[in-house]
C-alpha cells in the first residue's frame, strides 16, 4: 500500500512539472493582444466587392504546371515504415510576383476502409491567423501520432480515428509565412482577405492540375478557430469563380464547409463572454458579470466604427481570463476551462507539440516532405503574419446566406472552449437572415449517439439541423475538439460528409471501433494525463505503467523507462 502511495505521489509531481514545462509554447490561436498596425492596403469592405474582386490577377496559366504526383510522393518518412501510409507533400508557387509558396501535405483516403475515388476531398486549415495546419496532422485530425513524450521522439503510430478513413485529407499551411509556407520577401505577405482567397484558389487550381484524378470529387473545406473567418470567404470566392470560370480553370465541386470553434462573428462572440463565463460555466461571479456591460459597450462602439483591431475588444476577453482566477488558483485555460494555467493556455503543452517542432525542423524530414527550400524554421504560429491582418474582428456572417443557398454548412463547438465558445456560436447562428430562418428557429434539438474509442456507444453531443445548416455542441470537446475526442469527432465529420442524420446510430452508417489497436506511449503516463485533462485516471494508469516497467527493468541499482 505504501509503495502505491509513493508511486502515485511521484507521478503527480512529474505531471505537474510537465504541465508547467515552458518548452513548445503553444501560441494563442486567436491573438487578442494589441496587434501591430500597418500602413499597407486595407481589407476591402464588403460593400466595395465588385466584379474586379473576382478577377484573380495572380492566376497564372495552368499550362505552366508541369509537376506530376510522383514529384510530391513522400518516401522514407523518418519514423514510419514504408508502405504503411501513402502521402504527398511539397510547395506550390501560387504568386509568382512575390514568389509566394504554400506548403501542403496530402493523405489520400485509407484504401483499406474506402476507395479514394469514392471519398470526398476535405481541406483542413488551422487558424491563428498564421498557425500551421501541421498541428492537425500530428495532434488532431491527421494520421500521424508520436510514440512517447520525449522531444526527440521520431516513431509514429497511425491514428485509428484519422479523418483520412473517411476522406482524402489535404492540409495546407496558409497564408504565406505560416508553417512551412514562405515568400522571398516579407513585402509579399498578405494583408487582407482578397489576397488570401486568391492564393487559396490558385493553390487548389494547381493542385487539381497535378492530382487530376481528384479534381471532380466532392470538395469540402474544414478548419477551426480563425479558420471560421477564412472559410466563409474562401467558399464564397470559389462559388463566384465557378460562376465566372476563366479559360483553363477547373471548376471546383464545392459541396460544403465544416467550421469548428470558429471565430466568425466577433460582434456577437465577444459580447457572449460574460454570459458564457457566468451562466454557462460559473468561472466569473455576479460582480464581474455586472462590470462587463461597460466593457462590451466600449468594444461594440469600436466595431460599429469599423475598427476591427482595438484594445477595447481585446480587453473584454483578457478581463474574463483575469477574473477567472483567484489568489489561490490560476486563471482558466482559454481552450479548455476544466484546466487552470498561469498563462491562460498560452503555454499549454499539447501532447505532441514539442515533438512536432523538433521533427519538422530536421533536415532529413524536410527532405522527405519536399520542403528543403523553405528558408525559415517551422513554428506553430507566426506573429508577423498575424500582425499584418488587421481586420481580425470583422464579421464573416454576411456571407452565410449565400453559402447556405448553395452548399451544406456544419458548425460545431467543443463544450469546454472559452475563446470561441458555444454560447456565442449559438447566438450568431440565430442571427442569420436566410430562406430558412423560421425553420431554423423551430428545428428540434437532436441528441447524438456516437461511438467511444473502445467501440461502446456514448453521447456525442446535441444539435439541430434545418435545410443546409447543422450545429453540433460536442460533449467533452475543447477548442481543439478532434484532439481530445477523436472518436466522436470522426463520427461527426463522417456523418457530415456522407450527409447522414445525427439521429442514426453510428453502426448504421459504418462507424465502429477500428480494429487497429493504439500503442500506449509509455513516458510516465503524461500523455494520458494531459489528454483527459489531468484527471486521476491519468495518474493511476501512469503509475501502473511505471510500476510494471520498474519491476521489469530494474538493473544495477537504477530504473530505466523503456518505450
UniProtKB/Swiss-Prot annotation:
Q: Where in the cell is it found?
A: Membrane
A GO molecular function held by the record: serine-type carboxypeptidase activity
Give the source lineage, highest ranks first. Eukaryota, Amoebozoa, Evosea, Eumycetozoa, Dictyostelia
Tell me a GO cellular component.
Answer: membrane
According to its UniProt entry, the function of this protein is described as: Probable carboxypeptidase.
Q: Which organism is it from?
A: Dictyostelium discoideum (Social amoeba)
Q: Which SUPFAM superfamilies match?
A: alpha/beta-Hydrolases
> What name does UniProt use for this protein?
Serine carboxypeptidase S10 family member 2
Instruction: Report membrane topology.
Output: Single-pass type I membrane protein
Cross-referenced InterPro entries: AB_hydrolase_fold, Peptidase_S10, Ser_caboxypep_ser_AS
Amino acid at each position: 500500500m505504501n509503495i502505491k502511495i509513493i508511486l502515485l505521489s511521484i507521478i503527480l509531481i512529474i505531471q505537474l512539472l510537465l504541465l508547467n514545462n515552458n518548452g513548445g509554447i503553444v501560441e494563442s490561436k486567436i491573438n487578442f493582444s494589441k496587434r501591430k498596425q500597418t500602413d499597407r492596403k486595407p481589407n476591402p469592405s464588403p460593400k466595395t466587392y465588385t466584379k474586379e474582386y473576382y478577377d484573380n490577377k495572380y492566376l497564372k496559366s495552368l499550362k505552366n504546371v508541369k509537376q506530376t504526383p510522383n514529384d510530391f510522393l513522400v518516401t522514407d518518412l523518418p519514423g514510419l515504415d514504408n508502405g504503411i501510409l501513402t502521402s504527398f507533400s511539397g510547395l506550390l508557387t501560387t504568386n509568382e510576383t512575390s514568389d509566394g509558396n504554400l506548403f501542403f501535405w496530402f493523405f489520400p483516403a485509407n484504401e483499406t476502409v474506402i476507395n479514394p475515388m469514392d471519398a470526398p476531398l476535405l481541406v483542413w486549415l488551422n487558424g491563428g491567423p498564421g498557425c500551421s495546419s501541421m498541428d492537425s496532422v500530428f495532434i488532431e485530425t491527421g494520421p500521424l501520432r508520436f510514440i512517447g513524450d520525449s522531444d526527440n521522439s521520431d516513431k509514429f503510430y497511425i491514428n485509428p480515428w484519422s479523418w483520412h478513413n473517411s476522406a482524402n485529407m489535404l492540409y495546407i499551411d496558409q497564408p504565406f509565412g505560416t508553417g512551412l509556407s514562405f515568400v522571398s520577401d516579407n513585402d509579399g505577405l498578405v494583408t487582407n482577405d482578397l489576397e488570401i482567397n486568391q492564393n487559396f484558389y490558385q493553390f487548389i487550381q494547381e493542385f487539381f492540375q497535378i492530382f487530376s484524378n481528384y479534381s471532380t470529387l466532392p470538395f469540402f473545406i474544414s478548419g477551426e478557430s480563425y479558420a471560421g473567418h477564412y472559410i466563409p470567404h474562401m467558399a464564397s470566392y470559389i462559388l463566384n469563380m465557378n460562376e465566372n470560370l476563366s479559360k483553363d480553370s477547373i471548376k471546383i465541386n464545392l459541396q460544403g464547409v465544416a467550421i469548428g470553434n470558429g471565430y466568425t462573428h466577433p460582434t456577437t462572440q465577444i459580447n457572449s463572454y460574460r454570459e458564457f463565463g457566468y451562466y454557462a460555466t460559473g468561472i466569473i461571479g455576479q460582480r464581474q458579470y455586472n462590470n462587463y456591460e461597460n466593457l462590451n459597450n466600449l468594444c461594440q462602439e469600436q466595431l460599429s466604427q469599423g475598427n476591427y483591431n482595438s484594445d477595447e475588444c481585446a480587453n473584454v476577453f483578457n478581463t474574463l481570463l483575469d477574473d477567472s482566477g483567484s489568489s489561490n488558483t490560476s486563471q482558466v485555460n482559454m481552450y479548455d476551462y476544466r484546466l487552470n494555467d498561469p498563462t491562460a493556455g498560452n503555454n499549454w503543452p499539447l501532447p505532441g507539440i514539442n515533438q512536432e517542432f523538433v521533427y519538422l525542423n530536421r533536415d532529413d524530414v524536410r527532405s522527405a516532405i519536399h520542403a528543403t527550400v523553405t528558408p525559415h524554421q517551422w513554428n506553430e504560429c507566426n506573429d508577423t503574419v498575424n500582425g499584418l491582418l488587421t481586420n481580425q474582428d470583422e464579421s464573416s456572417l454576411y456571407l452565410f446566406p449565400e453559402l447556405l443557398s448553395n452548399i451544406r454548412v456544419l458548425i460545431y463547438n467543443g463544450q469546454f472552449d472559452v475563446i470561441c465558445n458555444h454560447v456565442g456560436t449559438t447566438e450568431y447562428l440565430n442571427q442569420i437572415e436566410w430562406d430558412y430562418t423560421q425553420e431554423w428557429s423551430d428545428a428540434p434539438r437532436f441528441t447524438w449517439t456516437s461511438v467511444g474509442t473502445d467501440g461502446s456507444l456514448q453521447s456525442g453531443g446535441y444539435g439541430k439541423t434545418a435545410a443546409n445548416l447543422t450545429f453540433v455542441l460536442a460533449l467533452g470537446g475543447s477548442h481543439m475538439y478532434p484532439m481530445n475526442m477523436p472518436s466522436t469527432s470522426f463520427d461527426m465529420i463522417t456523418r457530415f460528409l456522407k450527409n447522414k442524420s445525427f439521429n442514426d446510430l453510428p453502426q448504421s452508417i459504418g462507424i465502429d471501433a477500428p480494429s487497429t489497436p493504439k500503442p500506449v506511449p509509455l513516458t510516465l503516463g503524461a500523455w494520458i494525463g494531459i489528454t483527459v485533462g489531468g484527471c486521476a485516471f491519468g495518474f493511476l494508469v501512469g503509475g501502473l505503467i511505471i510500476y510494471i516497467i520498474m519491476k521489469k527493468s530494474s538493473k544495477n541499482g537504477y530504473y530505466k523507462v523503456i518505450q
